[in-house]
């Protein structure tokens, strides 16, 4: 009689484990796996940004599950300057940024570099870390005014 109780208890444990596995798989399939979309409005043909350091660079970050945080850095090959970092407290599906040039003299010496934008969304994927999107764009700093001649 005790052998039958042990056998049936193992059966109940096995059925419970199966329900847990099915539940975890069903939950994992509902998670958002798409990375946030990063759009830089000043890009020329999707590659380079020509920046005169007077007008801000406009960046749009969006995702269906909401934006958790973002970071914008400029690297000129010798130094890395953090232009903007924020942890978004409200649940926003899109964030619009205007990145202005910093006033430090190190940044003003650069003639080109790369702009790196990293964004995380509110998804529970990656062990609640969220999905990550990284966009790197070349920046050409153009301080010269155009020369126009009237004939």
Listing of model-derived features with the role each one plays in the protein:
Residues 63-78:
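Solvent-exposed loop/turn segments flanking beta-strands in beta-repeat/beta-sandwich domains
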Residues 89-103:
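Aromatic sugar-binding surface patches on proteins
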Residues 46-53:
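Short, solvent-exposed loop/linker segments at the N-terminal edge
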Residues 117-121:
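Conserved structural position at the C-terminal beta-strand
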Residues 29-36, 41, 127, 135-149:
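Flexible, low-complexity linkers/stalks enriched in Thr/Pro that connect modular domains
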Residues 3-19:
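N-terminal Sec-pathway targeting helices
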Residues 103-112:
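Surface-exposed, short loops/turns at beta-strand junctions within beta-sandwich domains
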Residues 55-63:
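Short edge beta-strand/loop segments characteristic of extracellular beta-sandwich folds
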């Amino acid at each position: 009689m005790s052998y039958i109780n042990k056998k049936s208890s193992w059966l109940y444990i096995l059925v419970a484990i199966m329900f847990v596995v099915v539940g975890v798989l069903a939950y994992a399939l509902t998670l958002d796996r798409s990375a946030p979309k990063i759009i830089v409005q000043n890009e020329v043909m999707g590659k380079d940004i020509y920046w005169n350091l007077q007008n801000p660079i406009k960046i749009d970050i969006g995702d269906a599950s909401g934006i958790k945080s973002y970071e914008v850095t400029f690297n000129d090959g010798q130094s890395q300057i953090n232009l903007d970092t924020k942890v978004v407290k409200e649940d926003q599906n899109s964030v619009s940024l205007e990145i202005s040039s910093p006033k430090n003299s190190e940044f003003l010496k650069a003639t080109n570099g790369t702009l790196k934008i990293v964004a995380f969304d509110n998804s529970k994927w990656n062990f609640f870390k969220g999905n990550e999107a990284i966009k790197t764009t070349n920046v050409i700093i153009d301080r010269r005014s155009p020369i126009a001649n009237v004939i």
